[in-house]
């Protein structure tokens, strides 16, 4: 499980150092792809495989699935962190997420999200008021 928020910097080669506590789950490889709200999703290879298999069960005649799958899979790149825990974020994905230098890496349960630091701050500020309301809708009786 991935938890917490971290603030690494993207280097000149497009590499990002992942938090040490995330590395064990990713040593078998990972997939990075477009996420929602212009962030990037990073999945351990096993989790990405599980998602892929789940999507395979939906009929290809479902237009929404075709549309989503085209973007999700065509933008995906696999990688293995190096000895320093760095991954290379491909240029098209850096562009999509607006990643320049300062980033935020968030644990999001079964995935990691990579955000441009300013975009993440703006997102947090826009969601602060609705956070309590959303918990009642999304997590009734859980918390």
Curated annotation (Swiss-Prot):
InterPro entries: MraZ, MraZ_C, MraZ_dom, MraZ_N, MraZ_sf, SpoVT-AbrB_dom, SpoVT-AbrB_sf. Residues 5-47, 76-119 form the SpoVT-AbrB domain. One of its GO terms (molecular function) is transcription cis-regulatory region binding. Keywords: Cytoplasm, DNA-binding, Repeat, Transcription, Transcription regulation. Gene3D superfamilies: Transcriptional regulator MraZ domain. GO terms for cellular component: cytoplasm; nucleoid. PROSITE patterns: SPOVT_ABRB. It is found in: Cytoplasm, Nucleoid. Forms oligomers. Belongs to the MraZ family. This is Transcriptional regulator MraZ. It comes from Frankia casuarinae (strain DSM 45818 / CECT 9043 / HFP020203 / CcI3). The lineage of its organism: Bacteria, Bacillati, Actinomycetota, Actinomycetes, Frankiales.
């Amino acid at each position: 499980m991935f938890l917490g928020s971290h603030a690494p910097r993207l280097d000149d080669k497009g590499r990002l150092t992942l938090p040490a506590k995330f590395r064990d789950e990713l040593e078998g490889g990972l997939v990075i792809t477009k996420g929602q709200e212009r962030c990037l999703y990073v999945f351990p290879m096993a989790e990405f495989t599980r998602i892929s298999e789940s999507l395979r069960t939906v009929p290809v005649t479902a237009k929404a699935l075709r549309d989503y799958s085209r973007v999700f899979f065509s933008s995906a790149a696999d990688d293995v962190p190096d000895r320093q825990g760095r991954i290379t974020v491909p240029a098209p994905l850096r562009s999509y997420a607006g990643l320049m230098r300062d980033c935020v890496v968030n644990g999001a349960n079964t995935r990691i999200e990579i955000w441009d630091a300013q975009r993440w701050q703006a997102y947090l500020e826009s969601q602060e008021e609705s956070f309590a309301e959303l918990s009642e809708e999304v997590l009734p009786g859980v918390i």
